[in-house]
A protein has these predicted regions:
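Flexible metal-binding regulatory segments at protein termini and peripheral loops
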Residues: 1-132, 142, 252-254, 334, ...
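Transmembrane helix-loop-helix hairpins at the membrane interface
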Residues: 90-245, 356, 457, 722-727, ...
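Hydrophobic alpha-helical transmembrane segments
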Residues: 138-149, 173, 209-239, 345-441, ...
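Conserved cytosolic catalytic loops of P-type ATPases
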Residues: 28-47, 54, 205-207, 236-330, ...
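Conserved ATP-binding TGD loop and adjacent catalytic N/P-domain core of P-type ATPases
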Residues: 18, 353, 436, 516-518, ...
Length: 840
């Protein structure tokens, strides 16, 4: 099966979307089709052995629309709002020309109602034909300017797939044709001297209704096009980050080339203020990089030789040479844009109701309009009255508002998430996340830093600690397990010389064994020792005491004799407790899974306030526990690293990969967090809830609008309350309904992440009685009084800042007389050669 993408032209409403989907789904070999009205794009899953792209294009064209395949070579960083901007410009031009002809038309038709003097040539019985023909002359250009409504509308009627343009075309055409008919009847009666009958027809001309309907629809389309452009602002900002050029080293010379021409293996320069053109690795120099646009992290990150940099990051200082690892078209930025656009173009399950309604909406509206016409004629009302009712039904009905209700909110929501470094892969994932009531957390790398350290060691029997560390470090040197790295890292840091290890064996969920200097070394948990017949009872009291403090005990046996115990701790992330509290406030239960012993797990549970904990688990147990929770009726999200937790992430209702960095294409995850901050998972769930609330609001008002508007236009309330809707007001209402839906979706841009809300609260709480604000900046790299003096100087040089720097605390205590962004404070200190760890 292959996934193909197409641009689709000619769609104007949800009915168009439904017709295209229906036509393509009938093609033999098409497995799935998804059409996005907002983006004018279509995604098709097809069997290449049965069909091809041309067959899909033919199906779209046979339905009355146009399509072309989006090739792999198309620029992935092309602006997603370009089409909306072009559409907006075209609509604006049509609008001004339409208004130019509508104003004199209304002046002639309605001027007398506003007591505006009208030239005598347009008044009186003798001038009735001049009055009518002048209206005709001003209406024809408006029809010509907006003729696409008629061409598209009637073409789709012929193809038996009527859409919103069909409703507009029928309503405007009916007004115009009846008015032309009335003009001819006026001429007929005036030629026979029957001025009374001619006057009666003159009073029932609808030229101004025809002109006003078309102009008001164009007003709505113009505003809608502008709003559509704004829904993709987040992606457009990402696109604008990509630098146009890069400076590469070629034949020992600096050469400026287009960014897309930087090839894998090329070496490019990175200076202060320059943007990174593509993903790469530093091979010389060092720099400080601002990755905020990609990850949402405001503090610049120091990069040294061997470190990776991401495309569209900005160098905040330093000089470096970087080797290109991925071209611009395959870079992290391009992947982010592709993910966000794919998510925006996907369809949420909540949209199915709107799709079903849209598929039959226009035929039903046309039927209601015809019924309205016939009923009012049967009730004895004039043809002009009945026609007025039918036209009102046609022009007030709005399938657009239904079609835009979901995709606008999805596009804004996924774009907003990307600004926070949260990548949501599909609309379905976004919808599912809003109903999550249980979050399962992997301990290592999610709740903790994922970088265990050897804290202490205790030898037993005839063994000493130095010997214990050397043998353990040597045995673990062949393992890539985080606990093994903690042991070998400690040995390296403390200059402990290691020996080669032989016969290395790893027991999943237990530990390792190896032969070092002819001695059998066994390292692992108590279960491994018990299974190997090693008695560790002498160390159990000590092990429990350390485990109560969150440390992991690793038992060591040498030549099948208990030799000692290593204590390893994985530091809890600073933001983990805050994130767990955030989940609690959102009504979400938290469950931590770990392979550690129960004592260690309980200690971490207590520190973080986690609801439940499952310990001493094998890797395959995580997916089983998630299934158990799902069987209890819970909606489960799993948060892990996306590699070791792949089965669990796939099993969960929503899989969230944390700390992905450049590796954002994790297939097992539905949501990818660029940073290792658990708060972003809280933000993802809260954003999902906001998006779903917005979608439901949009669908509710779209359905209510049509449910009330159509009966009102048909005259249901005329007999009871005397309410009668003029077609012009119906057209205005239809135009505004779509604009209101899009505008409501744009409110999601006001959503704030957990980090932003925390910062806002901190800002309020740090204000002193005199209105000044206080902040504390943690700084690395200060070694002496000269350092503190330098930091004090650069901070005090900023307008509105008074700083007191403490060498002992490694902090700057800042008082602000006015609002100064954290980024400004950080940059000043970073440029001075120091590292900012955080600002509170």
């Amino acid at each position: 099966m292959k996934k193909l993408k197409f641009n689709v032209t000619g769609m104007s409403c949800a009915a168009c979307q439904a017709h295209v989907e229906k036509a393509v789904s009938k093609v033999n070999g098409v497995m799935d089709v998804n059409v996005n009205l907002l983006a004018n794009k279509m995604t098709v899953d097809l069997d290449e052995d049965v069909t091809n792209a041309q067959a899909v294009i033919n199906a779209v064209e046979s339905a009355g629309y146009g399509a072309n395949e989006i090739g792999d070579k198309e620029n992935k960083t092309a602006s997603p709002v370009a089409a909306a901007q072009d559409e907006s410009k075209k609509m604006k031009k049509r609008l001004w020309w339409s208004v130019g002809f509508l104003i004199p038309l209304f002046y002639i038709c309605m001027g007398h109602m506003a007591n505006i003097p009208i030239p005598p040539i347009f008044t009186g019985h003798k001038n009735m034909m001049i009055y009518a023909l002048t209206q005709l002359l001003f209406t024809v250009p408006i029809i010509a300017i907006n003729f696409h409504y008629f061409s598209n509308g009637f073409k789709n009627l012929i193809h038996r797939s009527p859409n919103m343009d069909s409703l507009i075309a029928l309503g405007a055409a009916a007004s115009f044709i009846y008015s032309v008919y009335g003009t001819y009847r006026m001429a007929y009666f005036m030629g026979r001297g029957d001025l009374g009958s001619a006057h009666e027809y003159m009073m029932n001309l609808y030229y101004e209704s025809c002109g006003m309907i078309l102009t008001l629809i164009t007003v709505g389309k113009y505003l809608e096009a502008r709003s559509k452009g704004k829904t993709a602002d987040a992606v457009n900002k990402l696109v604008s980050l990509a630098p146009k050029t890069a400076v590469i080293i070629r034949d020992s010379e600096e050469v400026e080339v287009p960014a897309e021409n930087v090839m894998v293996g090329d070496v490019f320069l990175l200076k202060a203020g320059w943007s990174v053109p593509c993903d790469g690795v530093l091979i010389d120099g060092n720099c400080t990089v601002d990755q905020s646009a990609l990850t949402g992290e405001s503090i610049p990150v120091d990069k040294a030789v061997g470190d990776r940099v991401m495309s569209a990051s900005v160098s905040a200082g330093g000089f470096a040479k970087v080797r290109c690892e991925k071209q611009a078209k395959d870079s992290t930025l391009s992947q982010i844009i592709a993910l966000v656009e794919d998510a925006s173009a996907s369809k949420a399950p909540v949209a199915r109701l709107a799709d079903k309604i849209s598929a039959v909406f226009v035929p039903i509206v046309i039927t209601i309009a015809l019924i309205s016409l016939v009923v009012w004629l049967l009730l004895g009302y004039s043809f002009a009255f009945a026609l007025n009712m039918a036209i009102s039904v046609l022009v007030i009905s709005c399938p657009c508002s239904l079609g835009l209700a979901t995709p606008t909110a999805i596009m804004v929501g996924t774009g907003k998430a990307a600004q926070f470094g949260i990548l949501i892969k599909s609309a379905e994932s976004l919808e599912t996340a809003h109903s999550i009531d249980t979050v399962v957390l992997d301990k290592t790398g999610t709740c903790t830093e994922g970088k265990p350290e050897l804290i202490s060691a205790q030898a037993f029997g005839d063994f000493d600690v130095s010997e214990l560390k050397k043998l353990c470090g040597s045995a673990e040197s062949g393992s890539s397990h985080p606990l093994a790295k903690a042991v070998t890292g400690h040995c390296k840091t403390n200059g402990i010389e290691l020996s080669p290890a032989e016969s290395y064996t790893e027991t999943a969920g237990g530990g390792i064994s190896a032969v070092v200097e002819g001695r059998n070394v066994l390292i692992g948990n108590k279960r491994l020792m018990d299974n190997s017949g090693v008695d560790v009872s002498a160390a159990e009291k000590t092990a429990h005491a350390h485990a109560d403090n969150g440390e992991i005990p690793l038992y060591v046996a040498i030549d099948n004799k208990f030799a000692g115990i290593l204590f390893i701790a994985d530091k809890i992330k600073e933001t983990s407790a805050e994130a767990i509290e955030g989940f609690k406030k959102a009504g979400i239960e938290t469950v931590m899974l770990t392979g550690d012993n129960e004592k260690t797990a309980r200690a971490i549970q207590k520190k973080l306030g986690i609801s439940q904990v499952r310990s001493q688990l094998m890797p395959e147990d995580k997916a089983t526990i998630i299934k158990e929770l799902q069987e209890q009726g819970k909606k489960v999200a799993m948060i892990g690293d996306g590699i070791n937790d792949a089965p669990a992430l796939t099993t969960a209702d929503v899989g969230i990969a944390i700390g992905a960095g450049q590796d954002i294409a994790i297939e097992s995850a539905d949501i990818v967090l660029m940073k290792s901050d658990l708060n972003d998972a809280v933000t993802a769930v809260k954003l999902s809830r906001s998006v779903m609330k917005n979608i439901k609001e949009n669908l509710f008002w779209a359905l209510i609008y049509n449910s009330l508007g159509i009966p009102l236009a048909a005259g249901v309330f005329y007999g009871l309350l005397g309410w009668k809707l003029n077609p012009m007001f119906g057209a205005a209402a239809m135009s505004l309904s779509s604009v209101c839906v899009v505008t409501n979706a744009l409110r999601l841009n006001l959503f704030k992440s957990s980090r932003e809300n925390k910062a806002a609260k901190a800002e309020i709480n740090t204000k002193t009685e005199d209105g000044k604000m206080k902040k504390v900046m943690k700084i690395d790299g200060m070694m002496c009084s000269h350092c503190t003096g330098t930091v004090t100087k650069v901070l005090n040089a900023i307008d509105g800042v008074t700083a007191d720097v403490s060498l002992e605390d490694k902090c700057a205590y800042i008082t602000l007389d006015k609002n100064v962004a954290d980024e400004v404070l950080s940059k000043a200190v970073t440029d001075a050669g120091y590292k900012v760890k955080g600002i509170k």
